[in-house]
Amino acid sequence: MGERPCILAIDQGTTSSRAIVFDAAASVLAVAQTEFPQHYPADGWVEHDPEDIWRSTLEVSRQALQAAEAKGARVVAIGVTNQRETTLIWDRRTGRPIHNAIVWQDRRTAADCAALAADGNETMVQARSGLLLDPYFSATKAAWLLDHVSGARMRAENGHLAFGTVDSFLLWRLTGGRVHATDATNASRTNLFNIHTQDWDPELLRLFRVPAALLPEVKDSADSFGQTDPALFGRPLPVLGLVGDQQGATIGQCCFEPGTIKSTYGTGCFVVVNTGATPVPSRHRLLTTIAYRIDGRTDYALEGSIFIAGAAVQWLRDGLGIVRTAAETEALAAGLPDNGGVYMVPAFTGLGAPHWDAAARGTLTGLTRASGRAHLARAALEASCYQTCDLLAAMREDGATPAALRVDGGMVANGWMVQFLADLLDLPVDRPVVMETTALGAAYLAGRKAGLYGDFAEFTRVWRRDRRFDPAMPTSTRTALLAGWQDAVRRTRSGAPD
């Protein structure tokens, strides 16, 4: 029997790096994962050491590759998916970053964004990039690096530095510094890319003061991105797919038709609805973004971004020490008859969509002497569901009419949370058999380019549902819970009275 052709999917996330090998039937053959440190040098600042990103990625890739090939598989291509917006600048000659990566959650440029908005720039920025003026995106992060690292701006203007999101940095390292490129989905998250012309926008570059010489080439999501340095894996492997993590999950959930919608629950939560070949401007402060670009065809999406989802549970574990594992929260939440009036608004780094309040900070409301660790665990889980409900309401106002929501990410292993989500949304929620949908999306792109996977219709037949969660909550209960949540959000907003 010959070796089975497979795809290595690299999933470089906010708190961990993962590598997963998929076969031609989109089944998982091998998985490797490792966490890496987070750095918080100041209030609202979040950084990663780029060498931690690279070392952890290389480590898990080698582990998964070795495990799969021990089972008779042969990896024929690599697909990469990544935490988006996180910004790096490195020296083209040495490959060394000039500073830690500034993570998507980082809010250090909030005042810069506010100043640009006060000068009347947000309408132009949104019209061209589909995004709002917010420190979430890469442009002001890049400008901050150029302004705060000694000599960086001059080196950038002289063509000695390279900018990239995490995919671009990994591609540079994987190819031994031979390829400086990104894909359209990652480019569309920078505030520098025109989603209509499909190119870097000169007016946006001027506004954010980012030299064009810094920027990578923008390619399709399924494309030839060069070959890996043979020293890394013992032989060169073609990199045939790049995609931002939420777009990767959109592909992995087979949301190829307009109106299909998915929500991913990892460090943050991201709801994405496919809008087809036409970009739909949001009237409710959602993001108009690129879902994927394949064979020159672009499909667009509306996205709502929640900065803190699973990270709230991680805080309960690592910050407060009230749970040993994230899995404990399910039994704690289920053991309560109700939430006891306790709400957590986890605005640790501000509020994302639809509020976009960079100055908001987290709150716990409704605490009494009867409140215990179970109430905190339940409040952390419920918070992701309430925020999803806010996003779905905005999407419906913008014309989306979802029949069901497909969910993925580490949090959705928690059946209690997914049922609460269905109840709160009053909408069926589908959980897939293959939970690694982000990595699966990257694998599909590389596998499609390699000839291992077929078109959208063929790949859609591979998707299988593990369980459907149907809503069962009385309307009166839902209404009361949502009213309590909205009151908690009002107390959290930066303009709220003391």
Curated annotation (Swiss-Prot):
Which of this chain's residues are annotated to bind glycerol? R84, E85, Y136, D245, Q246
Q: Which residues bind ADP?
A: T14, R18, T267, G310, G410, N414
Q: Which SUPFAM superfamilies does this UniProt record tie to the protein?
A: Actin-like ATPase domain
Catalytic activity reads: glycerol + ATP = sn-glycerol 3-phosphate + ADP + H(+)
Positions with a binding annotation for ATP: T14, T15, S16, T267, G310, Q314, G410
Q: Which UniProt keywords apply?
A: ATP-binding, Glycerol metabolism, Kinase, Nucleotide-binding, Transferase
**Pfam families attached to this UniProt entry:** FGGY_C, FGGY_N
Q: How is its activity regulated?
A: Inhibited by fructose 1,6-bisphosphate (FBP).
**Which of this chain's residues are annotated to bind sn-glycerol 3-phosphate?**
T14, R84, E85, Y136, D245
Any one Gene Ontology MF annotation carried by this entry is: glycerol kinase activity
* Matches recorded under Gene3D superfamilies: 3.30.420.40
Q: Which residues cross the membrane?
A: none
**This protein's name:** Glycerol kinase
Which species is this record about? Rhodospirillum centenum (strain ATCC 51521 / SW)
Query: What gene name does this entry carry?
Result: glpK
